[in-house]
C-alpha cells in the first residue's frame, strides 16, 4: 500500500472545491447565527459560553483517545489557567491539567502565526503528566510509526507515517504551508478547505510519539477560529467522537492518495455540525 507522503508530489493536495457549493449557504448561516447570539450576550455570559465549549472539547478530544476525565477536573484546570478566581475543586487526575491548559493556549494564541515552537509547546502542555514519552520534541528512532488495530498477531496496519528522520523537514513545510495559505474571514469556502487540509496534513506527518490526534484537532480549531478572526465557540471533537468510525475510515482513505475531495467534503460537514452543536449549547 502506498501512503500520501510517499508520492513524489507530496504534499500537493488535489481537490475539487465545487463539492462545497451546496454547503456554503448553510455554513454562512450558522456562522451568522452564532455571531448574533454571542453578540447579544453579556460579557460574563460570553465568557461562560466559551468556557463550556472548551470543557466539551477537552472532554471529547480525550475520550476519542480512550482517556476519560470529569468535567469538574477539566473546568478547574481551564479556570486556573484563565486566572478565574473562585472555589476551584481539587483536580484528581493530573492529565486533566494538561488538556485543560491546551484548550486555553489554543484560544490565547489563535491570532498568532503558527510556529513549530508553538506546536511543540502545545504538546509539552498536553502531555506533561505522561512519564513514558518525550514531550515537546519530535519522535526519533528507527521503529516505524504505525496506526494499528486488532488483536496481537492479527494486527491491521491502517497507516504508516513518514520516518522520524523526515519529521523536521515535514513539519517545517507544514508550518510554511499553513502560514502562506492566508484566508480572508469572508472567504468561507477556503476556511473549510484550509481547516480540513490542516488536520489531514498534520495527522499524516504524525510527528510526536503520542498525542498526535489531540494536537491535530487543536490545530484544526486554531485554523478555524483564526481564519474567521474571532474566537468562535466550537467543539470539533464532540462531533468527531459521535462519528468516530466514519472519521477514521475517511482519514485512512485520504491518507492513501493526494486526491482529497471526499475528505474536504466530509470534514467540512463535521465543522458545520460542530457549529450547530455550539448553537444548541448556547441557547
Residue ranges and their predicted role:
Residues 1-283:
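FIC/Doc superfamily catalytic core
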Amino acid at each position: 500500500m502506498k501512503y500520501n507522503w510517499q508520492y513524489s508530489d507530496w504534499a500537493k493536495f488535489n481537490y475539487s472545491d465545487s463539492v462545497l457549493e451546496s454547503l456554503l449557504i448553510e455554513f454562512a448561516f450558522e456562522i451568522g447565527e452564532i455571531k448574533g447570539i454571542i453578540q447579544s450576550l453579556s460579557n460574563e455570559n460570553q465568557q461562560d459560553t466559551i468556557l463550556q465549549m472548551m470543557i466539551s472539547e477537552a472532554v471529547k478530544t480525550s475520550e476519542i483517545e480512550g482517556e476519560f476525565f470529569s468535567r469538574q477536573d477539566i473546568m478547574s484546570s481551564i479556570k486556573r489557567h484563565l486566572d478565574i478566581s473562585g472555589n476551584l475543586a481539587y483536580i484528581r487526575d493530573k492529565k486533566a491539567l494538561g488538556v485543560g491548559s491546551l484548550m486555553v493556549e489554543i484560544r490565547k494564541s489563535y491570532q498568532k502565526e503558527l510556529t513549530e515552537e508553538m506546536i511543540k509547546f502545545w504538546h509539552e502542555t498536553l502531555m506533561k503528566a505522561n512519564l513514558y514519552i518525550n514531550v515537546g520534541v519530535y519522535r526519533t528512532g528507527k521503529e516505524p510509526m504505525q496506526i494499528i488495530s486488532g488483536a496481537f498477531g492479527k494486527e491491521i496496519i491502517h497507516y504508516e507515517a513518514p520516518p522520524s528522520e523526515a519529521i523536521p523537514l515535514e513539519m517545517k513545510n507544514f508550518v510554511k504551508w499553513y502560514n502562506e495559505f492566508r484566508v480572508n474571514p469572508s472567504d468561507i469556502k477556503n476556511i473549510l478547505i484550509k481547516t480540513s487540509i490542516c488536520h489531514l496534513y498534520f495527522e499524516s506527518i504524525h510527528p510526536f510519539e503520542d498525542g498526535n490526534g489531540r494536537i491535530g484537532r487543536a490545530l484544526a480549531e486554531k485554523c478555524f477560529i483564526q481564519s474567521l478572526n474571532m474566537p468562535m465557540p466550537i467543539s470539533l471533537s464532540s462531533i468527531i467522537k459521535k462519528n468516530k468510525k466514519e472519521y477514521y475510515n475517511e482519514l485512512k482513505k485520504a491518507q492513501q492518495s493526494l486526491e482529497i475531495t471526499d475528505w474536504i467534503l466530509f470534514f467540512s460537514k463535521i465543522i458545520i455540525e460542530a457549529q450547530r452543536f455550539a448553537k444548541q449549547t448556547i441557547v
